[in-house]
Structure formats: C-alpha cells, structure tokens
Amino acid sequence: MLDEQTVTAEIAAMQLGDFSTATIRDIQSLSKVLEEKTGQPFIHLEMGVPGLKPSQIALQAEQKALAEGCAAIYPPNGGIPRIKKAASEFVKAFIGIDIDPLGCIPTTGSMQGTFATFMALSHAFRGTGKDTVLLIQPGFPVQTTQCDVIGLRHVGLDIYNYRGEALIRKLEEMVAEGNICAIVYSNPNNPSW
C-alpha cells in the first residue's frame, strides 16, 4: 500500500506543484519513481499502453497479413475501405452517430491524427474568423501544445461542472460566439478514437 507521505514527497521532489495540472508524462515519471521506491507495481494506463497482450485472433490475422505481403505496399492514401467502414460502424454502435466512412481517416495514433486535423483546420479556416478549436476537458493535454505549434487558437471547456442540459447550453453559448472551427473531445479512456 502506498503511503501519502511518500507520494507527496515525490510530487514535491519532481516540482509538480499543483498535481492536478500534471501532464501525462509527469504522471508516468511519478509512477515509475514510486514503483522503484516502494516496490509496488502499478498498472500503467497513463500513456494509453496498458501492457495487455494482444488477442490470439489479432496475432493470427497479423501473421496472415504479413505472410500475404501487406508490408510490401503502402495502404491507400485515404485508408483501407473495410477499416473505414468498420470505424463508421463503431461510432454508430458506440455513440449512435452516423459518420460516412469517407470521413473516417485512419492514423497511427491520436497525436498524429489530431496534429493533421489541426493543420487542416488551420488552412481551411484561415481568414474566416473561425480560428479557434474548442477542446473538451479533461482531454489529451498535448493537443493544446499542437495548436500552439501550428498557431491555431484554442479554448478549453472543463466539463466537470457541466452535465446534460447544462453542457448543451454551455456548448451552444461558446459556439454562438462565432469563432469555433472545431470541437475536439479526446476521451481520456482511449484518446485514439
């Protein structure tokens, strides 16, 4: 069992200050140090890498694809049609929204996907007055940095105090200002989708 004094001392030693503003990498570093100092194992979910073994079905499918030469060619620029279709079906099943498979763009991860999205938004909305991305919080902290690097304005909305109708009203209020070009919600449970 971890004791509060050890955790508090490490937070102070790492100069994290207000721990509620720590980044994902800060959390990862802290958990590694605490593991080493206490001998207590942690389940690492902070980087989206829980260390779970892939399913046998996935391993067999990957082996089959490699044996058939999939690594010898690049996939189509817009993505593999059956994967785009599956992504569309997933969104429909999970949150009940119809998304055209054409709008499902596969990436190697959420960092790459959001960076490409922010680049596209920056170019598509330049000079229109819609120059700000609304980032729903809690989200993926690196996205604010990505916007800064690109020069795309961003504003956050911490949904802790907004649920149901209150959230809808707040979103409508923010969008009504006329400067929002996109709303980004990276679910902390799995930012990659």
What are these regions (language model features)?
Residues 2-7, 14-112:
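N-terminal small-domain helix-loop-helix segment of the aminotransferase-like
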